Amino acid sequence: HTQLSKNAAKEGMVLLKNDNHVLPLPMGSKVALFGKGTFDYVKGGGGSGDVTVSYIHNLYDGLKMLQDNVSVYEETADFYRENVEKQYAAGKVPGMTEEPKLPGKLLAGAAAYTDTAIISISRFSGEGWDRKAAEDQKRKKKSEDDRMVAESEKLFERGDFYLTKAEEALVKQVKSAFRKVVVVMNVGGMVDTEWFKADAGISAVLMAWQAGMEGGLAAAELLTGKGNPSGKLADTFARKLEDYPSTAGFHESDEYVDYTEDIYVGYRYFETIP
């Protein structure tokens, strides 16, 4: 079953960008890992979409399982592992942790070790509050949602469709120090792609989704050429969140959903828009 889970994860992942054939990583590559998502791995959706598993392989785990193919700079890995563990101990849930500020000394050490960086971006996925626009401040809150919505608003200044300020700062830091920058997106839905689409400083982007207990290993195998990222996008990724017709009326009520876009839901809207 674990092999089936890993294979399904690999087949669903999508290679969104690969300039100059940076991926797959050559045999014997050295990489430096950045981003709390390296350890703050989200295996799947919350609420009714959640399942209990005996273990979870994050991206670091996956790469370490392939250490005959790739070597990891342990200093940055230790930094993010310790930070995420502290946040979990304080009650944070996967995908809802803060991106820590990267010390310049760690960045310099990593850059001396290799010219290849891997940034992991992760997002929690749950019903009712995971797709929030920045101007949507009127949603009613109740029970556990109250705390989660408050945390979401604090973490994601413009909504979780976009990078946070801390994530933007991290990306800028890493781009300034590395010739090859690979991004792994551990997300459950559509996100902003404008920040990497035309940026020559971002070499490759793997949409790894929330790929279950073996998701980290699946992503690592694709990064190192042990498989082909042949998945295709099943959704339309808009330039900005407001381009989706449902954004304007989303979260107006907890009791009902008002389809203000009429029948033009999803692909119907994008296929008929003038």
Where are these regions (language model features)?
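C-terminal non-catalytic regions of proteins with extracellular/luminal or membrane-system context
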Residues: 2-274
